Structures are given as C-alpha cells and as structure tokens.
C-alpha cells in the first residue's frame, strides 16, 4: 500500500494537480496516490512509470466519467499493479468500470466508505475484474451499483478468489449476469442470497466452472425475466446442494448445459419448471453422475428443437419418465441417453421423431438397459451407433417406420408375436423392413416344448399342448387328465425312464410324454391248490379319489348264498362238493366286500385274505371250481 508521506524511505518522484507518485527505497516499489478531482484519463506524466507502479490509493477524491480499462494490465498500462484502494471518495459521476481491472495481476481491491451525493451514474461493471488471476482480497461495499444494468463477466476467471460476499451488492437494475462468476475455480463461499434478479434476462454461464463451490443459495432468485440460462451451473463439479424449485422459467428459451457436469449434485427438483418457451435443452443434464432421481414428467417440450446429449452420462439414474415429452419439433437427439448406465427401462413410445434428423449414439453404452419402447420412431438421416453398447437390451418394441438398428447386438432375436427366429442382426433388419406395424423383438433363441397327453386331455380338450420360451426361462408344468388313470409325471421318452425336471431353465426344445397309471390296481392269484394252501390273498392299491372295493361276483360264479363254492370232479362233472368261503366280515354279512380301500391324500394300499375250507369225505379225484371277483370304483 502507499506508505505515509513522512516515511523516510518514501520519496516523491512526481506529482500533479490530483496525484502524487512515490518511490519506496526500502522495497523498490512505486506507489500512486490520487485525490481531488480525478478525471478518467491517464496523464502522460505517468507514462514512464506505469510499468512499475504496484499500489494505488484514491482517497477524498471525486471521480468523473468512464474508468473503462483504467487499471487494466496492458502493454501501455499498469503491468505490475498489486493493489487498489478507493475510499472516502465521491463516485456519483463514474459511468463505467467496464474492464477496469481486466487481466491485472492485482491481488487486492478495496472500494469502501465512499460517497454518492447525487444519484449514481455507474451503468456497467462488465468484465470489471475479469482474468484477475491473483485476486485474493476483495471489498466493494462502497460501490453503489443500483443503476448498473450490465454485470457480464464481472468476476470472470478470478481463479484464486476463495470467498466472495456480495450480500450488499445492489443488482436491482441488472439485465445481464452472463458469465458473472465463470471460472472462479477456487471460490468456496459465494453469498448471492440477497441478489435482486427481477430485471435480469441473461444468466448464461453465470456460475460456470465454480468447481470448489459445494453450496450455493439461489433459492430467492427472481428469474421471471430470464430468457437465457444456458450453462448457468455448468461444470460446478462440487455442488452438492442446489435449490431451484422456485425458479420461474416461463420466459427461458435456452436451457442448454444448464446443469451440465454438476457431478456431485445428488438431488435436483425441476418438477415445477415451466419449459413452454424453451427451444434448446442441449446437454441440459450432462454428467450429473450422482443424480439418482430426476422428475421431468411435467416438462413442456413443444418448442424444443434440440435434445442432443440432454441426459448424457446421468449414470446413477435408474428411472426416467419422459412419456409426456412433445418431441414433434426436435431435430436432433444425438447422444440423448448416452452412458445412462443405470437405466434398465426406457419408454419412448410417445416420442414423435418425424422432425429428427440425427439419432447418432442416442443409446450408446446404456449397458444395463433391458427394455426399450420406440413405438413411433422414424428413420433419421444419421443413426450411427444408435444402439451400440446396449449389451443388456433384451426387448425392443419398435416402429415399422424405423428401418435400421445401427449397433444393435448381432445375435439371436425373435419376433415375440409371430415367433419368427433370427440368427443375426441382418436377418432381423430384413424382416423388420417388411413389417406394417410396430413389432416387439426379444433377444435369444425361442424354444418349444411339446406336451403329449398320451391319451389324456388338457383343459381345452386338446391332447397336445405346445409352449414357447426363450433360453433361460422356465417351462410351465401343465397337468392333463385321463379317465380312470392317475398322472405319474412327464417323461422325455415313451419308455418312461427319463423324467423331466421343470425346476431347470429351458435350454433346448423337447417333446414330453405323459405317464399314466390306472387309478387302482387289484392283484388276485390266478389259481391255488387246496392241497397246498387254504387262503387266497387279495391285494389292492388306490391312487385315485374314489372308493375301491373287491368282492365276489355272484352272478358269474358258483357260490351259494351261504358263501360255499361248488367244486366239480374233472372226470365226472356230475360229481360235486362244496368248499366253504370266509373273510373278514362275511359271518355277519355274506355279501360284504372282501377288500375296501378309501382314497387318501397319498396312495393307499391294502390286502385281505379269503379263506377256503377244503371239503371232506368226498369221492377220490381232482376237483376244480371258479371264483369270479367284482371290482367297484366309485
């Protein structure tokens, strides 16, 4: 700073009506002090010293006119200036500070405690501190900006500035804040919470590359007059919180790159955005890598002409509802969803692409996208790599007016409706070009399972049923019915040695055969010899849902009412004898069934014994007789 004039190291080098130039022999620095009526022109007497002056103090002075580029670093200007202090001065007559400190190596600017005896005349501070790479200390509390209309690039590229409190800056008349804080890469604190932005129409790149900002309070911004928000927060890579929910965007026409590369932003509420006037959404949400949710369902896109790279690299988004988008005016969708690596489904069935000429890389590297609906898409002039990298895409429902599938996996696909199989992409595209309506295609090889009921029937009375699946899916087990029989499973062979396992995924086409077992089984010995045995065992198995009973058929056998079997001599059938029969329950009821098996939750089995008493005191010879049994299942 300018030292006290009584400093013994300080020597007056030159002076004028409103200025004094000092040389400090202790540090070899030149300083300039101004006072009184200071004009906006630089006197020729300074010419030989401009390259040496490091400090300027303006105190108790009256400044008048345009100070545009006054302190600017240039060949014929202040080339080594480090600090400027303007205090206790009348600044009412200053009309411009445009580029006042542009590209200066200045480290410190203090403008405070100044007077405005009349209304301020200052209209522009455009680029006032642009490219002040070394600026670290800053105070403009004494600068009345109430009449300023242009603050474009005011702090642009102040790369080392870490903190900026502009809470008292009057912005009520400002029209342009274009790039106002652009490339303030080290800015960690920025207070703009009291900004009156009611007159602002241009916020293009306002906070561009404010890479160190984690918080920014713009919740009170009045954006009702803003038409340009292009790149407003672009590349503010550390920004974690941003409340724009109250933004009035009804006048905005440009939202290109609005939130581009806001990589740390985890939440963003744009659900109330009025986008009815917007014509470009180019790269609007590019590389918003941390956003897991984004509600754009209310966006009015009827005026939008470009959606290029709109959601490019929104890699954490798992869902995205764009079903209400009016895309009838859009001409380019290039890279619109490129690298949306968490999106599993995308429904663009309502998209009107009749005006679109460029779909290049539209879905490129959407690596987990499984389902894609393009019901109304039409062929665009440029479609290179449209589907490249959609390695997980398993379902594509697509308009017949979209003729080419550039980059789609060259593998097995099939028409899900007509079950037409394609072994490569070329076959698929050839087939699709002959379609007359939107068609759904699934990735994979479809398989068929033919189920032969083997004399049985399915619910539809058919004896055969065919299922169609793709590799990896699971077959459905369908059970047929057959009168008087029990279903014993599906087999891969008609010898019923290889039972089919429905718990395994489908891998090949196959034919299955139904195995049937009669609902019941009754086992009765064909013959017995009374010389060797006096009992006949009756065995039964009930597999069905009815009662099984086994008894004597009295109309077809020679058994008396008292259960005696007639045996005849084989040599002379007129010689006969009786063999008494008995079984459990026959004493009280001679007609009682020999064996009864009721149905159960599982297969039931049982047996009964029919006792045959050998006749005595009969004529010698061989005797035979027949027993006929009746089986009832009801």
PLM-predicted stretches and their roles:
Residues 422-444, 492-513, 593-598, 614, ...:
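Serine/threonine-rich, repeat-prone extracellular segments and beta-strand-based repeat modules
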Residues 1-18, 393-449, 489-491, 516-518:
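Extracellular/surface-exposed low-complexity segments
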Residues 517-572, 596-634:
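N-terminal small/polar-rich segments of proteins
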Residues 445-518:
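Secondary-structure capping and domain/repeat boundary segments
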Residues 74-75, 388, 454, 476-484, ...:
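Acidic, Ser/Thr
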Residues 29-37, 51-63, 76-95, 104-123, ...:
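Structural signature of tandem-repeat unit edges
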């Amino acid at each position: 700073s300018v030292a006290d004039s009584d400093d013994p190291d300080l020597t007056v080098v030159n002076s004028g009506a409103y200025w004094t130039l000092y040389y400090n022999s202790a540090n070899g620095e030149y300083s300039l002090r101004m006072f009184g009526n200071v004009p906006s022109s630089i006197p020729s007497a300074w010419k030989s010293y401009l390259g040496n002056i490091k400090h300027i103090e303006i105190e108790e002075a009256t400044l008048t006119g345009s100070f545009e580029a006054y302190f600017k670093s240039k060949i014929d200007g202040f080339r080594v200036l480090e600090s400027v202090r303007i205090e206790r001065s009348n600044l009412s007559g200053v009309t411009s500070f445009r580029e006042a400190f542009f590209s200066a190596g200045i480290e410190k600017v203090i403008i405070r405690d100044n007077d405005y005896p009349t209304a301020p005349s200052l209209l522009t501070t455009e680029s006032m501190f642009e490219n002040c790479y070394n600026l670290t200390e800053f105070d403009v509390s004494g600068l009345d900006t109430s009449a300023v209309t242009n603050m474009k690039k005011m702090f642009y590229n102040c790369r080392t500035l870490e903190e900026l409190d502009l809470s008292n800056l009057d912005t009520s008349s400002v029209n342009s804040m274009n790039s106002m804080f652009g490339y303030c890469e080290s800015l960690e604190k920025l207070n703009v919470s009291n900004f009156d932005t009611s007159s602002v129409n241009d916020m293009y790149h306002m906070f561009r590359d404010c890479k160190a900002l984690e918080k920014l309070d713009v919740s009170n911004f009045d954006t009702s007059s803003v038409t340009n928000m292009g790149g407003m927060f672009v590349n503010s890579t550390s920004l974690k919180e941003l409340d724009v929910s109250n933004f009035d965007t009804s006048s905005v026409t440009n939202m290109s790159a609005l939130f581009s590369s806001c990589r740390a932003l985890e939440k963003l509420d744009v659900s109330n955005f009025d986008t009815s006037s917007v014509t470009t959404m180019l790269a609007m949400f590019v590389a918003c890598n941390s956003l897991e949710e984004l509600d754009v369902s209310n966006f009015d896109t009827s005026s939008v002409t470009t959606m290029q790279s709109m959601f490019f690299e929104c890699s954490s988004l798992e869902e995205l509802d764009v079903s209400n988008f009016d895309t009838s005016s859009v001409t380019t969708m290039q890279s619109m969803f490129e690298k949306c690596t968490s999106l599993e489904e995308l429904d663009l069935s309502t998209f009107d692409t009749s005006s679109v000429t460029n779909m290049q890389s539209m879905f490129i590297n959407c690596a987990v996208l499984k389902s894609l609906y393009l019901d109304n898409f039409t062929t665009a002039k440029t479609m290179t790599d449209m589907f490249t990298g959609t390695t997980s895409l398993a379902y594509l429902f697509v308009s017949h007016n979209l003729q080419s599938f550039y980059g789609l996996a060259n593998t097995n696909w099939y028409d899900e409706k007509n079950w037409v199989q394609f072994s490569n992409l070329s076959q698929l595209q050839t087939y699709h070009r002959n379609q007359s309506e939107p068609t759904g295609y699934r990735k994979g090889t479809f398989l068929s399972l033919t189920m032969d009921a083997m004399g049985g029937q399915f619910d539809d009375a058919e004896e055969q049923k065919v299922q169609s699946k793709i590799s990896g899916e699971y077959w459905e087990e369908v059970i047929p019915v057959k009168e008087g029989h029990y279903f014993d499973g599906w087999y891969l062979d008609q010898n019923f040695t290889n039972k089919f396992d429905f718990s395994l995924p489908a891998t090949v086409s196959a034919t299955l055969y139904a195995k049937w077992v009669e609902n019941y089984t009754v086992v009765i010995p064909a013959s017995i010899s009374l010389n060797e045995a006096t009992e006949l065992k009756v065995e039964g198995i009930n597999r069905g849902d009815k009662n099984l009973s086994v008894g004597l058929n009295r109309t077809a056998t020679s058994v008396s009412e008292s259960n005696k079997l007639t045996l005849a001599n084989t040599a002379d059938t007129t010689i006969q004898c009786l063999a008494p029969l008995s079984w459990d329950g026959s004493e009280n009821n001679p007609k009682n069934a020999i064996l009864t098996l009721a149905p159960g939750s599982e297969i039931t089995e049982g047996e009964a014994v029919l006792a045959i008493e050998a006749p005595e005191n009969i004529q010698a010879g061989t005797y035979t007789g027949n027993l006929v049994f009746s089986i009832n299942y009801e």
